[in-house]
A protein has these predicted regions:
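N-terminal helix-turn-helix DNA-binding core of bacterial DNA-binding proteins
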Residues: 22, 26-65, 91-98
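N-terminal leader segment of winged-helix/HTH proteins
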Residues: 1-35, 81, 92, 101-102, ...
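Alpha-helical linker/hinge and terminal dimerization helices associated
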Residues: 62, 106-110
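Beta-hairpin "wing" of winged helix-turn-helix
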Residues: 78-87, 94
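Alpha-helical residues within the helix-turn-helix
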Residues: 60, 77-78
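A cross-family signal for key residues in well-ordered alpha-helices
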Residues: 42-45, 77, 104
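Base-recognition residues in the alpha-helical recognition helix of bacterial helix-turn-helix
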Residues: 45, 71-74, 89
Length: 110
């Protein structure tokens, strides 16, 4: 049975040019990968609500072992989403505002 609804063309290159931005695509993919676990998203949200927090305080917010939180923090730090400053035997974490602004801009441009 054929549909009487007209379907739009599948891909018309003249309709809208494709804006190829490989560097931005790579950065967005890296940031999304870093946020690819719900606990990491929660850590970033928690840090956005605070100015800075020690790793132990962050670990208290999640139902996982401190060592697991440490791994999540490393992923976020490696992607540049958070920064950690050593304070004696502890590390104090804060959100990298520039990286979050970049993430928001890149997601908004999708």
């Amino acid at each position: 049975m054929e549909s009487s609804l007209a379907s739009p063309p599948c891909c018309t290159t003249a309709a809208r040019p494709f804006d190829d931005r490989p560097e931005e695509d790579e950065r967005l993919a890296a940031l999304c990968k870093a946020l690819g676990h719900p606990h990491r998203v929660r850590i970033v949200r928690f840090l956005l609500a605070q100015q800075a927090c020690f790793a132990g305080e962050i670990a208290e917010q999640l139902p996982v072992a401190a060592s697991t939180v440490s791994q999540h923090l490393r992923h976020l730090r490696d992607a540049g989403l958070i920064e950690g400053e050593v304070d004696g035997p502890r590390r104090c974490y804060a959100v990298n505002a520039d990286a979050v602004a970049t993430l928001r801009r890149l997601v908004g441009a999708l």
